[in-house]
Regions:
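C-terminal regulatory/interaction regions
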Residues: 1-50, 285-313
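Active-site neighborhood of phospho(di)ester-bond hydrolases with catalytic His/Asp-centered motifs
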Residues: 105-109, 130-144, 160-164, 221-226, ...
């Protein structure tokens, strides 16, 4: 069949539909589990290969893939959690943590490539409807999205940020200290969260590490972009001051990964920040790199793509 002879770009464009489609299907049929099963590694490594080829940025095959992943996430968000803690990975370091009583959002953003949004505004609106509160770790555009924060505020839901994010906005709760903050936060639905805020950093930038415990006594830690050589000295023993996390959400390129993980001693570790598409390809962190690091880790770890979820039992 000579359909593509002499038309290499059209050929690769068609191939991209096939690749993204098959990756989507493989991830759907093989949902996240602890460890590194071959089929998931193959799917995620192939996703790396596609996402590190910038010719596919903002193309129809890429957009279809993202939309498909997000639609699956939205369908699953319609199913209440009866028991345990379910963690959803949205995009980049954006996560949703859900128990029977509460749905918590961390660092949810639309994301963008050259100014074009990745996750649609319509999808974000539906996510916000499901969530009770938004925590933002630090003042970078791939973690803090004004549109997302405004949707929470309009819905009368709390938005928690460090003091250097939108500092003049009185509708937002600004929380940051050099000491550990210990706070109870009341939600619109009448539920309460116990929250500890640790004074982390990404280099010199303040990076709040949130330790959030629900009424079911399920604890989630979101470390944001924690990366600081001095902080690790106190983080290595932080489990003495915090409840044991059911899920530790850790960025895949953090400083001294194993020391940070052992410092919290979590039941499950879930990585974030792979393939942040606003970056050049050298900092679109690869899933193959994440697996390389996590295979050294003694704790239960789970590596997820966009629009996936895992029930921590």
């Amino acid at each position: 069949n000579g359909e593509f002879w002499g038309k290499s770009e059209a050929y690769l464009h068609k191939q991209a539909f096939q690749m993204f489609g098959l990756i989507d299907e493989a991830l759907t049929q093989n949902p996240p589990v602890v460890g590194a099963p071959m089929v998931r590694k193959l799917a995620l490594f192939n996703l790396d290969a596609m996402l590190h080829e910038t010719k596919y940025d903002n193309t129809e095959p890429f957009n279809n893939f993202v939309d498909s992943r997000m639609q699956k996430l939205l369908v699953e968000l319609n199913n209440p959690v009866k028991k345990g803690l379910k963690i959803f990975k949205v995009y980049n370091d954006g996560f949703i943590a859900r128990t029977q009583s509460t749905t918590i959002a961390f660092d949810i953003v639309r994301g963008s490539i050259q100014g074009k949004e990745i996750v649609s505004e319509e999808c974000i609106k539906q996510i916000v409807e499901h969530c009770d509160i938004l925590f933002i770790t630090h003042n970078h555009g791939d973690h803090a999205d004004r549109l997302v924060a405004d949707l929470f505020i309009e819905a009368g839901k709390p938005v928690i940020v460090p003091t250097n994010i939108w500092p003049d906005d009185k509708a937002i709760q600004h929380l940051r200290s050099d000491e550990i903050i210990d706070k109870e936060i009341a939600l619109k639905n009448g539920k309460k969260l116990q929250v500890k805020i640790l004074p982390g950093h990404q280099s010199e930038l303040m990076n709040n590490i949130y330790v959030v415990t629900t009424e079911e006594k399920k604890t989630i830690v979101q470390t944001g972009d924690q990366y600081h050589k001095e902080d690790i000295n106190w983080l290595m023993n932080i489990h003495q001051k915090t409840p044991r996390p059911d899920a530790l959400l850790v960025n895949c390129w953090t400083n001294r990964m194993n020391d940070l993980i052992e410092g919290f001693a979590p039941k499950f570790v879930i990585t974030g920040h792979e393939n942040e598409m606003g970056h050049t390809i050298d900092h679109r962190e690869a899933f193959w790199l994440t697996f390389q690091k996590m295979e050294e880790i003694k704790r239960n770890y789970v590596v997820m793509g966009w629009g996936e979820w895992f029930l921590c039992k």
